[in-house]
Design a protein with these regions (language model features):
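C-terminal boundary and immediately downstream tail of ABC-type ATPase nucleotide-binding domains
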Residues: 210, 217, 221-242
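ABC family nucleotide-binding domain
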Residues: 1-220
Length: 242
């Protein structure tokens, strides 16, 4: 479904992504881990065109994202993203936040958009807050609304960029529960996270990145039980022993 072919990414002289070759398949849950500054979020943001690549090819459902003539907005309809800091519109209600993109981009009627928004709010256990404003919600509640907003576009894949790192500990579990539910339903998900318990329980594969490189791309159990790369071993021992 998504292919990285010899991807390089520079910010000026800084080499952010180095020769990335990855394939993400339909229905997979892939967790991407690694130390800060390793290129995880950059790699994720390349998938929906928030970041350009410097060299290589990025294919989504066989379409080269950066080829001349590619309509990037059409591609983006198939790629949902959930950010670390929710990015909800503060002056709009929960329901309005979710209805906005389907009405503007997918040209849904107000009635259809509302019906779908309520369906996805129910899925993330937030239907009772549909008329609330983001400022009246906890971080965890806002993140669940952001997930519903991503789902409302009917994407083929959902990208999660550290979705729990800005949350209070007591609200993290609610967000992870929603993500686990989506995984069980067969949603294709690529998740940048430090939540190792979630990775162990839900991921089909784990990708470990450091200094802009993919150092491990392995089936979850074998990665956690027997990481081969020395930096992956050090990273796991630090994060699991804390």
């Amino acid at each position: 479904m998504i292919e990285f072919k010899n991807i390089e990414k520079y910010y000026g002289d800084f080499h952010a992504l180095k020769n990335i070759n990855l394939t993400f398949n339909q229905g997979e849950v892939v967790v991407v881990i690694g130390p800060s500054g390793s290129g995880k979020s950059t790699m994720l943001r390349c998938i929906n065109g928030l970041e350009d690549i410097t060299e290589g090819e990025l294919l989504i459902k066989g379409t080269n994202l950066h080829a001349k003539g590619t309509n990037i907005n059409e591609i983006r309809k198939n790629v949902g993203m959930v950010f670390q800091h929710f990015n909800l519109y503060p002056h709009k209600t929960v329901l309005e936040n979710i209805m906005l993109a389907p009405m503007k981009v997918l040209k849904q009627s107000k009635e259809e958009a509302q019906k779908n928004a309520e369906k996805f709010l129910e899925k993330v256990n937030m239907l009772d807050k549909k008329d609330a404003y983001p400022s009246n919600l906890s971080g965890g509640q806002q993140q669940r609304v952001a997930i519903a907003r991503g789902l409302a576009m009917g994407p083929g894949v959902l990208l999660f960029d550290e979705p729990t790192s800005a949350l209070d500990p007591e609200t993290i579990e609610d967000v992870l529960d929603v993500m686990k539910k989506l995984a069980k339903e067969g949603m294709t998900m690529i998740v940048v996270t430090h939540e190792m318990g979630f990775a162990r329980e839900v991921a089909d594969r784990v990708i470990f990145m450091a200094d802009g490189e993919v150092l491990e791309d392995r089936e979850t159990v074998s990665f956690f039980e027997n990481p081969k790369d020395e930096r992956a071993k050090q990273f796991l021992s630090k994060i699991i022993n804390h």
